[in-house]
Structures are given as C-alpha cells and as structure tokens.
From Swiss-Prot:
UniProt name for this protein: Protein transport protein Sec61 subunit alpha
Tissues of expression: Expressed predominantly in epidermal cells of the embryo.
SUPFAM superfamilies assigned to the protein according to its UniProt record, in alphabetical order: Preprotein translocase SecY subunit
GO cellular component, one term: endoplasmic reticulum membrane
Originating species: Halocynthia roretzi (Sea squirt)
PROSITE patterns reported for this sequence: SECY_1, SECY_2
Membrane-traversing stretches: 33-53, 76-96, 118-138, 145-165, 173-193, 241-261, 289-309, 354-374, 420-440, 441-461
Length: 475
C-alpha cells in the first residue's frame, strides 16, 4: 500500500524543480563558495518585504518561533524553514510507522524525497493561505482577492527557493544542510544585533541604545554615578542587558562541554586481522533533532490556535487552546493563562515562576518530556537505531570486539536508546535553563546555534583530515 502511494504521487513529483547531483567531486573551496552564495541569497530574501501587504505591525503570535524557524516577519522569509521541517517530520513519521513503505534502492529514496518536497509545497500553500486569511497583513476584504493571491504566490516562490537552496547543499555542492545553516545564521544574527545594536529606544529612564555592549559604554559615559550605571547595564529591564549576554556565553560553554560526552565501543574488522577502530555513541546522539521537532510542533499549534481564535472568537473550547491578545507597540502576541499555548511557551524570566509556578512546572515537564520522546522516536524512523547500526557495521564487515555478530544488536541496545532518550532530556533541560537565566535568542535558539556550529566544526575537521592542512583547505 505504501509503495502504491509513492507511485501515485510520482507524476506530481516530476513537475517540481530538482538540483542534479554533481558529476565530479566538489573541492572544499567550491563548497565554501556555494555555501556563502546560498547564505547570501537567504539573507537578501530576509530583507525584501512582501509586496501588497497593508500592515505587519499587529501583534505577532509567532514571535518566539521566528528565531528558531529562520523566518522574518513581513518579508519573503515569512515562513522560513517551517514547511520543510514540517513535511520532513510528517514523512519520516509515516515511513517509520510503516504507513508508507520506502525501499533502500536509489529510485525509492528519490521518490520519497520528491514526495517530501511536494508535501512541503502543499504545506506552504496552506500556511500562506492561513496567514493571509487571518489578517496578518491586513483585512483580506480591504486588500482584495488579487493582492491576497499575489502575497500567497510570493510566499510560495520564496519557500521553493529555500527548498532548492537546502537541496543544493545536501546534494554535495556545499557544506552541511540549508536548514541548519539558515537556523544558525538567524540565531547568531539575533545575538549579535541585541549585543551591538546602535538603535535607540526611548524609555522612562531616557534614550538608551538597544545593544547591551553599546549601552554599557553609553551609560558609563552619560551617568555620573558609575556604580549605578554598571548596575543598570547588567540588569536593565525590557532591553538586552549584560546579564543576558553573560547567560548566552555560559550556555554556549555548557553545550560545547556536553558535546564531548560519548562512549566509544571497540570494533574490529571481520576480514583483516589487527584492524581495530571504535564506534562513538554521543550523549547528544540525535543532535538537535528533538528541539527542532518540538519547535515545529509548537509552531504548528500556534498557527492553528491563532487561526481558530480569529475565526471563532469567544468560543469556550477554542479559548482553551489559546486566547490571544495584542501587546502594545506591536510586541509579541500572548495568550491568557487559561489557554494551552500559554503553558507551552517559556516564562518571561526565572522570577516569573514564583508568580505562576504552575506555568513553570508545566513548561519544564513539556520540554523535557517532548524532547526525550522525539529523540527516542527519531532513532527508529531515521535509521539510527541499534538494529540499523548493527546492519551498517555488518555491511562494512566490522564486528564488536568480544561479541559475536548476532549479539551486537543486544550490546548496542544497551547504549543507543539510553543515549537517545537521556540526550533528548539533557537538550530539553539545557533549553529550559537558558530560558530561565535569560539567554539572548531563547534557550531553544541557543542550543540549535551551538549544535549546528559544532556540526560545521566537525565538517571542517573532516575536510582537513581528507585534504591535509587548513592552509590547503582555504588556499
């Protein structure tokens, strides 16, 4: 049945544009160039406003998700990577649950990737329609059908560009994946901007700079009481401060430290005597996948909640999912404490837990539980479970030292499921910690940025080992 499903959608997959695999080995310098070009195109799209929108100044219900989903409100990158991540999540879960069957042949894998791309485009259209019809860019009746259609087309084309850029890197022309690159860039851009932004903000204390570092020097230069100026630079409310920046650096260090935790299982060649190696099982076995899936889940819930809240305002059951209110100044939309979306969003600060401890406890439980669950589930649907690793080692004619071939799965099962679940739990705990201590860019965003940067570091090290020397790599 699953095979028939993929065959049915095959004619539709053909009409989608596709990046061909390189016919030759791409040199490292070329990969760096293509990665830079991809990033440049993405950043340009982040700055081009959507044509035809009447307003994007209303409260933003997806404020907390934008950094993680690499989206920028009111621009071509409005949807960011959300359609790609959502389609990939759903297709992987369907394949893992055996609802659709995907073989190991290149033809089946290509068909599955095409179906994932097609599903992503369908999600893009659906999400764009929801955004337009719920009034995110103005009243649809005032804009007219033509302008509404034009906005949907712009969002569709922009998402297609993102999909092709991601495919370009994944096919081997660049480094890593487009999704990871865009997420890390968006998060790092947010951190740098909130640290060094020269923009000024009028507060009750006078005009201040938005950037935490620039604000420090400005306060020291303009305040006569230097001790008070330092205190204000470290603890000023409602604007980035040096405590936020210090918390961000602390979380970076903690995540990098935990990245080094792993168990090396000794393996040897079944064909050649004396050839020994090791198979590493990291603490973060599934890397940043749990937090990405958790973010996609919450983002989808926000979209549904916002749409239903607008269409069925005042409905009691819809209100249980999320009742949204606008914050003055076009700030992020928030939900009332009676709504589910409120309890799935991070508290404002650690001290907010004392004002509403139920919110804090439910948020912690949700983060830890969902990350552990997604991590444990992902190894089953992505081909990285114990049985899959044992199969890979067998194909490479490698066996674990001290164990027969048949007992490898049992030995791997002692480590891999535990590493996946506990690693996901640690990812969730670090995200909660970063949220509570006020790290810039949200706890989830910091974790994604660090893990992605670490992945790119490993790619550089691997390329260096293959080519030899950093000077050879770059010059």
């Amino acid at each position: 049945m699953g095979f028939k499903f993929l065959e049915v959608i095959k004619p539709f997959c053909i009409i989608l544009p596709e990046i061909e695999k390189p016919q030759r080995k791409i040199q490292f310098r070329e990969k760096v160039l293509w990665t830079a070009i991809t990033l440049f195109i993405f950043l340009v799209c982040c700055q081009i406003p959507l044509f035809g929108i009447m307003s994007s100044e209303s409260a933003d219900p997806f404020y907390w998700m934008r950094v993680i989903m690499a989206s920028n409100r009111g621009t071509l990158m409005e949807l960011g990577i959300t359609p790609i991540v959502t389609s990939g999540l759903i297709m992987q879960l369907l394949a893992g649950a055996k609802l659709i069957e995907v073989g190991d042949t290149p033809k089946d894998r290509a068909l599955f990737n095409g179906a994932q791309k097609l599903f992503g485009m369908i999600i893009t259209i659906g999400q764009a329609v929801v955004y337009v019809m719920t009034g995110m860019y103005g009243d649809p009746s005032d804009m007219g059908a033509g302008i509404c259609l034009l906005i949907i087309i712009q969002l569709f084309i922009a998402s297609l560009i993102v999909l092709l850029l991601d495919e370009l890197l994944q096919k081997g022309y660049g480094l890593g994946s487009g999704i990871s690159l865009f997420i890390a860039t968006n998060i790092c851009e947010t951190i740098v901007w909130k640290s060094f932004s020269p923009a000024t903000v009028n507060t009750g204390r006078g005009t201040e700079f938005e950037g935490a570092v620039i604000a420090l020097f400005h306060l020291l230069a303009t305040r006569s009481d230097k001790v008070r100026a330092l205190r204000e630079a470290f603890y000023r409310p409602n604007l980035p401060n040096l405590m936020n920046l210090s918390a961000t650096i602390l979380v970076f260090g903690i995540v990098i430290y935990f990245q080094g935790f792993r168990v090396d299982l000794p393996i040897k060649s079944a064909r050649y005597r004396g050839q020994y190696s090791s198979y590493p099982i990291k603490l973060f076995y599934t890397s940043n996948i749990p937090i990405i899936l958790q973010s996609a889940l919450v983002s989808g819930l926000y979209v549904i909640s916002q749409m239903l809240a607008i269409r069925f305002r005042g409905n009691f059951f819809i209100g249980l999912l999320g009742v949204w209110e606008d914050v003055e100044g076009g700030g992020p939309a928030r939900s009332y404490p009676v709504a589910l979306c409120y309890y799935l969003s991070p508290p404002e600060s650690f001290f907010s837990m004392f004002l509403d401890p139920i919110h804090g406890l439910l948020y912690i439980t949700f983060m830890l539980g969902s990350c552990a669950f997604f991590s444990k589930t992902w190894i089953e649907v992505s081909g990285s479970a114990a049985k899959d690793v044992a199969k890979q080692l067998k194909e490479q004619q490698m066996v674990m030292r001290g164990h027969r071939e048949k007992s490898m799965i049992h030995e791997l099962n002692r480590y891999i499921p535990t590493a996946a679940a506990f690693g996901g739990l640690c990812i969730g705990a670090l995200s909660v910690l970063a949220d509570f201590i006020g790290a810039i860019g949200s706890g989830t965003g910091i974790l994604l940025a660090v893990t992605i940067i670490y992945q790119y570091f490993e790619i550089f090290v691997k390329e260096q080992a293959e080519v030899g020397g950093m000077g050879t790599l770059l010059f």
